[in-house]
From Swiss-Prot:
GO terms for molecular function: rRNA binding; structural constituent of ribosome; tRNA binding. Binds 23S rRNA and is also seen to make contacts with the A and possibly P site tRNAs. Residues 1-24 are annotated as: Disordered. GO terms for cellular component: cytosolic large ribosomal subunit. GO terms for biological process: translation. Residues 1-20 have a biased composition (Basic residues). Part of the 50S ribosomal subunit. CDD domains: Ribosomal_L16_L10e. The gene is rplP. Keywords: Ribonucleoprotein, Ribosomal protein, RNA-binding, rRNA-binding, tRNA-binding. This is Large ribosomal subunit protein uL16. SUPFAM superfamilies: Ribosomal protein L16p/L10e (SSF54686). It comes from the Bacteria.
Amino acid sequence: MLIPRRVKFRKQHHPRRRGQAKGGTQVTFGEWGIQAMSPAYVTNRQIEAARIAMTRHIKRGGKVWINIYPDRPLTKKPAETRMGSGKGSPEWWIANVKPGRVMFEISGVSEDVAREALRLAIHKLPMKARIVRREGGE
């Protein structure tokens, strides 16, 4: 699981899910990638589930890059608790993903294998996403 080792503050404000991604919109490391088409909070468990789905499908060949990191805590109050008395305890770690962001990349496998592996990973994510190819020559 991806979790920060140390954080300056244990609890943070919720990040905004508006606007487009400023950077990280191109496939830079691999040959194929998953690009977000809608905003979402992606938890560390969802990132890990997508990674496992991809690596199991490509077996021993290929390489996978994860371009997002869950660096923000999301808090939750216990069930049946009255309102007030402070903010809840940190429950999950999330990455704030905006539309256009390339989240995962893959290379070293054929087009059919890459597309199927990325399709399996997209089903593990909480937003609309598409498969994109690297632009330009090698």
